[in-house]
């Protein structure tokens, strides 16, 4: 009975010791998890005020002390807080030393009511002061802002689709993919929009006359740019675009006049650049610093238009010797119908399986590529057809896995290198392989005819052509070739 009286007196002393402390006038509710036998000690627990409340933070103020002859010292003290009434140390807590205690709590939720109390813990248990409530401010969304690059307009995460915001006196509208595609279909002005919420821009402007200034677009969340500007009139500066999350750039600028500096783009996540500049007869910008280490498809990347008209050829001929192409598997048509003539002999092409048409109708290329590891290539048909300048030693190539060499050197008038040691035992098609003579190119009805007189004259009689079943016109119209040729047994050359 005496013990219960002591506890009652202690709680009464604590409850009466504080000052008026805010919304909750009960300075101490007397909660404790133990018996208070510290009868000559006064526990002062006063939650005073909560100040400086923002959307995610607030400052707590209070008094915590022991007065008198206190047998049990404080082990820890501070504030507890929660979105529920009567918070305890089982909720959120923060320790604060001293008598006049003040601390700022962060990472709170906006527009939310919280409850806080002072607390102390000693060997007798946990004790709490009066409760004070407060509400954090509601989030005010500014909608859009100017990126640190000074060009890109970005939308805040809190911004809603359709909302507008002003940057430097210009009003921008937040859009998502559906809204953006509808605007484009209606031929609206899309120069004053925030595209932060758009992740897919595939075929966004395909087959349209689009040519608006969209340099301020935020494409940092876009992953797909497949066919984005295919067959458009687009030729605007988009060098500031953050394309670091894009994985697909297939036929992105196909058949467009685009020729802008994009050499600083981060393309490290792109896996496909297939036909990226196909039939783009304008692009010729330095992109040698691109990180293409994740690209697997480069087929037709710089391929010009079909035909031989010099005006329609791809103009691209920039130094890309430092590209890491070790993951590329497909290089067919990569430089066909173009003017490319840069050193790429140090490329690691060991994973490439298809080099068909790679330099077809490229009249300029003549760089050493004899050290290439082509051991995984299976298709070399038309690889150097009408590559009129190429004449580099490639006799050490391991072509043991190649099955198709159709028209590989047809109309390649300069090529005359020893390749008699090649292992062609798996090749089945050698039709037109060294064919020379008259050839036409261009569009039906607009053909241009050329006479090709080759110089190839090497002994390749040791070739194992036992697997070849197609060899028609193998060496058609090659008057310069006087040295022994292969002995075909399964077809007639």
Where are these predicted regions, by residue range?
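Negatively charged
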Residues: 138-493
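Phosphate/oxyanion-binding loops and surfaces in catalytic or ligand/nucleic-acid-binding neighborhoods
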Residues: 19, 82, 477-478
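Residue-level signal for mature regions of secreted extracellular proteins and peptides
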Residues: 9-10, 34, 55, 63, ...
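Short, surface-exposed linear motifs at loops/turns and structural transition points
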Residues: 22, 38-138
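Positively charged n-region of N-terminal signal peptides that target proteins for export
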Residues: 1-4
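N-terminal processing/targeting junctions
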Residues: 10-15, 114, 308, 449-450
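Terminal export signals
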Residues: 6, 16-17, 102-104, 196
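Bacterial Sec-dependent N-terminal signal peptides
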Residues: 6, 10-44, 137-141
